[in-house]
Swiss-Prot record:
Signal peptide, first to last residue: 1-22
Disulfide topology: C68-C74
InterPro entries: Antimicrobial_frog_2 (IPR012521), Frog_antimicrobial_propeptide (IPR004275)
Record has Manganese as a keyword: no
Keyword tags: Amphibian defense peptide, Antibiotic, Antimicrobial, Cleavage on pair of basic residues, Cytolysis, Disulfide bond, Fungicide, Hemolysis, Secreted, Signal
Function: Antimicrobial peptide. Active against a variety of Gram-negative and Gram-positive bacterial strains. Active against fungi. Shows hemolytic activity against human erythrocytes.
The protein, known as: Brevinin-2MT1
GO biological process: defense response to bacterium; defense response to fungus; killing of cells of another organism
Any Gene Ontology CC annotation: extracellular region
Organism for this UniProt entry: Amolops mantzorum (Sichuan torrent frog)
Phylogenetic lineage: Eukaryota, Metazoa, Chordata, Craniata, Vertebrata
Family label: Belongs to the frog skin active peptide (FSAP) family. Brevinin subfamily.
Expression across tissues: Expressed by the skin glands.
UniProt propeptide residues: 23-39
Coiled coil: none
Length: 74
């Protein structure tokens, strides 16, 4: 009975060590992933702002043209 408890304790100990090593590797990989994700998010927001600015400019030009034609001042 005692030898069975010792072997189970050794297996548990080895499993815990291997699990902690895997978690450390995973955390190291996630740290690298966070940097690229932040960069992607930065690029995405930049493209989004450029797109919004372009749409606002186009909408403003369209509204100016429509108001000119409605008022017949063109």
């Amino acid at each position: 009975m005692f030898t069975m408890k010792k072997s189970l304790l050794v297996l548990f100990f080895l499993g815990t060590i291997s699990l902690s090593l895997c978690e450390e590797e995973r955390n190291a990989d996630e740290d690298d992933g966070e940097m690229t994700e932040e960069e992607k998010r930065g690029l995405l927001s930049t493209f989004k702002q450029v797109g919004i600015s372009a749409l606002q400019g186009a909408a403003q030009g369209l509204l100016n043209t429509l108001s000119c034609k409605i008022a017949k001042t063109c």
